């Protein structure tokens, strides 16, 4: 009998490779005889590094090439940071597995200052995220936001070389790369609401590939699935991409889901925050309802302005 094989499409960055190898080790833990191959590749978002992400344009900057590999039969699954995954999938593909979420916070990283509040007037902060930018500027309009691209090591090197007074990164990425010592402080969600799906790893697969989906089942985390379902439902209703100032974060306790949402202008002068609570079985509807509340308060106009300037 021929051993089963799974081919994993992944980005080539150190963090993406860590995530793919993590999925490989998890699969082998549950299926010791499985053959698992990695297929590293570069995406559009990896190649175009001299332009802010919001200006590159299009959805799926970090996933499209991986999806093509699945559709063409070169790969069976793709491993993603869920915050990079668009709300719409190519026909026949879906997020069939969502793994247990790591820390979803944004991390403040600096060699000289302990937190955002301590930065001097006119300090230079590095990020490529409009979501982080709008929330930082809402708190500290005096701060200068400077675009920051590249993998985690590249971004840290730029900080260490003095290009920035501080940079903002996803805490989960630093933890996965065993660089938690570089986290100066975690930023509270009240200050910087995380991105939709931040800290969670998802697996994309052909929806008709029942054999592969069955192999992936032990990697599914039901609690994370509920939380991500609510966050992504909000984002879908808002028609938000990965490069827009939208934040969402769900907490699940005793079957009660607490969902926060945010839409802001790029300059931080307008920020709409809403929250909603309900039963976990209504995760999708809670996300939709929260988005409708945000839209009723002017989110549509803010997002239209963002898209117009991209």
UniProtKB/Swiss-Prot annotation:
Annotated protein name in UniProt: Porphobilinogen deaminase
* Other comment: The porphobilinogen subunits are added to the dipyrromethane group.
For activity, the cofactor(s) needed are: dipyrromethane
Gene behind this chain? Answer: hemC
Q: What's the family?
A: Belongs to the HMBS family.
Assembly behavior: Monomer.
Keyword check for Hydrolase? no
User: Catalyses which reaction?
Assistant: 4 porphobilinogen + H2O = hydroxymethylbilane + 4 NH4(+)
Give Gene Ontology CC terms.
cytoplasm
Name its species: Psychromonas ingrahamii (strain DSM 17664 / CCUG 51855 / 37)
GO terms of biological process kind:
protoporphyrinogen IX biosynthetic process
EC number from the UniProt entry: 2.5.1.61
- Cofactor, how bound (note): Binds 1 dipyrromethane group covalently.
Identify the taxonomic lineage of the organism of origin.
Bacteria, Pseudomonadati, Pseudomonadota, Gammaproteobacteria, Alteromonadales
Top enzyme class? transferase
Question: Which residue positions does S-(dipyrrolylmethanemethyl)cysteine occur at?
Answer: 242
What InterPro entries does the database record attribute to this sequence?
A: HemC (IPR000860), Porphobilin_deaminase_cofac_BS (IPR022419), Porphobilin_deaminase_N (IPR022417), Porphobilinogen_deaminase_C (IPR022418), Porphobilinogen_deaminase_C_sf (IPR036803)
Source superkingdom: Bacteria
Q: Keyword Nucleotide-binding on this protein?
A: no
Gene Ontology MF: a single term: hydroxymethylbilane synthase activity
**What does the UniProt keyword field contain?**
Porphyrin biosynthesis, Transferase
Pathway in which this enzyme or protein is active: Porphyrin-containing compound metabolism; protoporphyrin-IX biosynthesis; coproporphyrinogen-III from 5-aminolevulinate: step 2/4
Q: What does this protein do?
A: Tetrapolymerization of the monopyrrole PBG into the hydroxymethylbilane pre-uroporphyrinogen in several discrete steps.
């Amino acid at each position: 009998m021929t051993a089963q094989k799974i081919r994993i499409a992944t980005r080539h960055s150190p963090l993406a490779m860590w995530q793919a190898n993590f999925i490989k080790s998890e699969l082998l833990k549950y299926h010791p005889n499985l053959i698992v191959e990695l297929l590293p590749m570069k995406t559009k978002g990896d190649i175009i590094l001299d332009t802010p992400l919001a200006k590159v344009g299009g959805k799926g900057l970090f996933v499209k090439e991986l999806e093509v590999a699945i559709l063409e039969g070169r790969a069976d699954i793709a491993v993603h940071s869920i915050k990079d995954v668009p709300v719409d999938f190519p026909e026949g593909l879906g997020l069939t597995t969502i793994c247990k979420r790591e820390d979803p916070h944004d991390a403040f990283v600096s060699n000289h200052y302990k937190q955002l509040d301590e930065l001097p007037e006119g300090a230079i902060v590095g990020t490529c995220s409009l979501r982080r930018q709008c929330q930082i500027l809402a708190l500290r309009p005096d701060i200068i936001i400077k675009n920051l691209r590249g993998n985690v090591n590249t971004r840290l090197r730029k900080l260490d070389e003095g290009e920035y007074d501080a940079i903002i990164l996803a805490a989960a990425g630093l933890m996965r790369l065993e660089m938690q010592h570089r986290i100066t402080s975690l930023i509270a969600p009240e200050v910087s609401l995380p991105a939709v799906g931040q800290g969670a790893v998802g697996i994309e697969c052909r929806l008709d590939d029942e054999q592969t989906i069955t192999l992936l089942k032990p990697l599914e985390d039901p609690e994370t699935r509920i939380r991500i379902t609510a966050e992504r439902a909000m984002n879908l209703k808002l028609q938000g991409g990965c490069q827009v100032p939208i934040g969402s974060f769900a907490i699940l306790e005793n079957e009660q889901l607490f969902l926060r949402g945010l839409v802001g202008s790029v300059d931080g002068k307008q920020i709409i925050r809403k929250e909603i609570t309900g039963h976990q079985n209504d995760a999708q509807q809670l996300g939709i309802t929260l988005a409708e509340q945000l839209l009723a308060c002017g989110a549509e106009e803010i997002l239209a302005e963002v898209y117009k300037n991209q």
